[in-house]
């Protein structure tokens, strides 16, 4: 990848920004164990974002239903 200035002239020898590799930091055993760890707080913290998203989607769903009923 060449670095380009505003006039799109490639600058030789520039390879771009170093990209971060995800998931390679830390110990693999620790990562696996942390994924299996039981969620703190039970099911409620998991459900709250889903309920909030459903409540936010209600007006959009209702408007689509109203438009569909008006066309028929």
Curated annotation (Swiss-Prot):
Query: Keyword annotations for this protein?
Result: DNA-binding, Late protein, Virion
Q: Where is this site: Cleavage?
A: 27-28, 42-43
Annotated InterPro entries: Adenovirus_late_L2_mu_core
Propeptide positions in this record? 2-27, 43-72
Q: What are its GO cellular component terms?
A: viral nucleocapsid
**Record's subcellular location:** Virion
Q: Does the entry feature the keyword DNA-binding, yes or no? A: yes
Q: Which GO terms describe its molecular function?
A: DNA binding
Any Pfam family matching the protein: Adeno_PX
Family in the record? Belongs to the adenoviridae pX family.
Q: Its function?
A: The role of the precursor might be to condense the viral prochromatin for encapsidation by virtue of the two basic domains.
- Name the record gives this protein: Late L2 mu core protein
Gene encoding the protein: PX
């Amino acid at each position: 990848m060449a670095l380009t200035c505003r006039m799109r002239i490639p600058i030789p020898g520039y390879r771009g920004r170093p990209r971060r590799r995800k998931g390679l930091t830390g110990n693999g055993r620790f990562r696996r164990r942390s994924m299996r760890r039981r969620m703190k707080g039970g099911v409620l913290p998991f459900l709250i974002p889903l309920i909030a998203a459903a409540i936010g989607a209600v007006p959009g769903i209702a408007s689509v239903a109203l438009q569909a009923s008006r066309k028929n």
